[in-house]
C-alpha cells in the first residue's frame, strides 16, 4: 500500500491513505456528484457536535462496512508536543500536562480520516483517560458523557473535482466521453481544525483532521453510473 506525507495545521506530518477501493469513471456528472458528496459530509461535520458519530452515519448510509463502527487506530507512538497556540486554545498553562493521539479513523477496511488530537486529561474522568490510552475507541465516543461540542477554527477544501475555470468553459465544448477513464482522486479531500468543549463550555481537546478519499469508496451514484 503506497502512502505519502503532507503537513497540516501546526506543521505535523500526516500519513495519507492509499487508493480507494471503488474508483469512479471520469465524467462531468461523476465529478459533480463527487463534489456534492464531499461538501455534504463537510457540512454535516461542521454542523455536528461529533465528527465520530457523523462519520459512522456516513459509513452506514453508504454501506462502507458492516457493522458501521468507527475505530481509532494509533499510527504514531509519540505524537508531536502541543505548541503554544494549542495551549492557548485549550486555555491551559505551559505547566499543565497534555496528552495526544495520532490515529487513523477507520470504518471496516476504509480509512476515512487522519486525526491529531491534543487533550487535557485533568478535564476528563479517570475512566475516559484509561480508554484513550488503552483502546481504539475514538475520542468523540470516549467523551460522549460530557456532551461535547465542536468549535471550528478552520475548514479547508483540499481538492475540488471541478477544474479551475470550469464555469468559463466554452459552451458546446465536447465533454469527456463516458467511460473514458477513471476519476483520479487524491488522498486528502478536506481538513478541519476544531476545539472540543464540554457541556460546561470548558475546552477539553483540539483536533486536526484530514478527511480521506475512502469517504467515496462506494459505487458511483445512479446519475453517473453506467446503464446496463
Where are these regions (language model features)?
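Positively charged n-region of N-terminal signal peptides that target proteins for export
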Residues: 1-4
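N-terminal domain-onset segments
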Residues: 20-106, 110-190, 197-206, 210, ...
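Bacterial N-terminal signal peptides
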Residues: 7-15
